[in-house]
């Protein structure tokens, strides 16, 4: 078979043979096999050209995908599959890119954690789940997470949350809210408990009284038309306790309110 034409088409080249067969190949393929118009190729060489072209094209696709931002091995495999790269050569493409350090799940984890420490608000448990979803092995994630002390980040977040809720919630509800928020973000109970204790939050009696009477007004309006005196009182007490107010404070406020 003779090569009758090699023509550039955007990022690829078309290679035409005198047996009417056309191939899409990369520039690397042309260089590797030193292809030129008029060259004679046998069936074995043609098959090698096809395999190399597919491998080269897949690698170029991978490099293009990686050029926008860091990717995990799983993300890259999915991208290559979506672009119809032969599943048999994808492992070879991945190995090639890994050997040149274009993809490195350990480095990805390190960058992900560092970015979270700099600008994020997630603790290790949430970070681990996010990285697992990206196809990274658990042992790689855990190894990197164990090297990080998340207490400083938890402390910074607890201070922000405290400023947000300090004049809106009674002491118990405030501490519960901080604990719930920190654990939901992926920090373990011990770290959350420690940073909340370090805030040294004290009860503001004047604020608590103001908040409890505002809540009494709200709950009274809600229940007063539905329940009599005893049932009304119990409904209000239960509602306020669920919101973090202390039983004795509620009883004291009710004596003046009702």
Swiss-Prot record:
GO terms for biological process: regulation of DNA repair. Signal peptide: none annotated. Keywords: Cytoplasm. It is found in: Cytoplasm. InterPro entries: RecX_HTH_1st, RecX_HTH_2nd, RecX_HTH_3rd, Regulatory_RecX, WH-like_DNA-bd_sf. It comes from the Bacteria. Pfam families: RecX_HTH1 (PF21982), RecX_HTH2 (PF02631), RecX_HTH3 (PF21981). One of its GO terms (cellular component) is cytoplasm. Its main location: cytoplasm. Belongs to the RecX family. HAMAP family: RecX. NCBIfam families: PRK14135.1. Modulates RecA activity. This is Regulatory protein RecX. The lineage of its organism: Bacteria, Bacillati, Bacillota, Bacilli, Lactobacillales.
């Amino acid at each position: 078979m003779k090569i009758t034409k090699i023509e550039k088409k955007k990022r690829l080249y078309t290679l035409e043979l005198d047996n009417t067969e056309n191939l899409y190949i990369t520039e690397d393929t042309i260089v590797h096999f030193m292809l030129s118009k008029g060259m004679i190729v046998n069936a074995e060489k043609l098959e090698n050209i096809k395999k190399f072209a597919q491998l080269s094209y897949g690698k170029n696709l991978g490099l293009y995908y990686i050029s926008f931002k860091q990717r995990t091995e799983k993300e890259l495999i999915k991208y290559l599959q979506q672009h119809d790269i032969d599943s048999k050569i994808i492992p070879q493409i991945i190995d090639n890119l890994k050997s040149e350090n274009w993809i490195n799940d350990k480095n990805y984890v390190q960058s992900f954690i560092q970015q979270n420490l700099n600008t994020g608000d997630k603790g290790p448990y949430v970070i681990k789940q996010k990285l697992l979803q990206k196809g990274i092995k658990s042992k790689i994630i855990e190894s990197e997470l164990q090297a990080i002390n998340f207490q400083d980040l938890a402390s910074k977040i607890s201070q922000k949350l405290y400023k947000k809720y300090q004049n809106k919630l009674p002491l118990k509800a405030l501490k519960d809210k901080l604990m719930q928020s920190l654990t939901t973000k992926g920090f373990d109970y011990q770290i959350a408990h420690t940073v909340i204790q370090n805030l040294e939050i004290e009860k503001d009696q004047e604020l608590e009284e103001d908040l409890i009477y505002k809540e009494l007004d709200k709950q009274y309006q809600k229940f007063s038309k539905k329940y009599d005196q005893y049932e009304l009182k119990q409904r209000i007490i239960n509602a306020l306790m669920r919101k973090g107010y202390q039983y004795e404070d509620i009883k004291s406020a009710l004596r003046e309110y009702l």
